[in-house]
Amino acid sequence: MASNFYIVHHEFRAGTSSKWWETAYAAMAPGGGWDEAVAANKEKGFFNHSANAVTANGPVYCIWETKEGISIEEFQEFIDGPTGPGFGLSALMNICKPIDTSLMIGQTPYPRVFS
């Protein structure tokens, strides 16, 4: 078995997008802890390949990869939790959809991070 890929559809809860963007930009700024958070999430078996915002008020679509053995329930718990993309703000409603790579003869959306 190999790692798994997911498309995650994020919608902002009413009135939360500005605070979320402010928090995200602060985290990504030098010294904001972004690199450390990415490394910690990767160590736990979660890796975000891309984040794709449609507008500042959403939606945002992301491609995530999880290491082998992480269930969809565990992934959803991570995505909804304080170390996921919501920064613990309860700003996002997250719909996680697994990508069935077997339908595309094993083609993955990105090269695997977890082998």
Give a label for each model feature.
Residues M1-P59, E65-E77, C96-S115:
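Short S/T/G/P-rich N-terminal loop/turn motif that feeds into the first structured element of a domain
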Residues I79-S90:
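A common structural junction motif
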